[in-house]
Amino acid sequence: MQTIEQQITNVIEESLTDMGFELVLVKFKGVNPKVVEILIDSLNSEKVSVEDCTKASRTISAILDVEDLIEAAYSLEVASSGLERPLVKFENYNRFLEREVKIKLKELLNGKTRYQGKIIKAENNKIYLKCEEQEVLIDYDLIKNANLVLTEEVFKKLLKQ
């Protein structure tokens, strides 16, 4: 059985893609009322504006009203995934090659559960990281969560835009 987050993903992802957005994450916060938080990113590597979030929110709201997946009252929050966005799909690692990432694992690998390094490559369900002077191979299924890291290099590129 799919979680409510997976069901929401299934009904909104295609519409967001058609609008030029990647659906990054669907998450519930709070209790009464529930808050449905949806993080989006641009498919063409442009910044996500407030107007983009508003358009996406209207589309998502209409779909959720029709699909009626959420029984109780809720608030909808649509936001940019941000500079230190989560990497939740295997494909994300290829999109962000050469970027710094923090990874938390579900279990120990070489005596550690946390790694930070540059993504060298991602293939065959494996992530290759350059951590300091060594290369670390991480099985994608071991990853609990991962986020991009805002480095000085990335920050300088943003200032030039």
UniProtKB/Swiss-Prot annotation:
Similarity comment: Belongs to the RimP family.
Key words of the record: Cytoplasm, Ribosome biogenesis
InterPro entries per the UniProt record, alphabetical: Ribosome_maturation_RimP, RimP_C, RimP_C_sf, RimP_N, RimP_N_sf
GO cellular component, one term: cytosol
Subcellular location: Cytoplasm
GO BP term, example: translation
SUPFAM superfamilies in the record: YhbC-like, C-terminal domain (SSF74942), YhbC-like, N-terminal domain (SSF75420)
Primary localization class, coarse: cytoplasm
Protein species of origin: Rickettsia rickettsii (strain Sheila Smith)
Record's protein name: Ribosome maturation factor RimP
The protein's role, per its UniProt record: Required for maturation of 30S ribosomal subunits.
Pfam families, alphabetized: DUF150_C, RimP_N
Secretion signal span: none
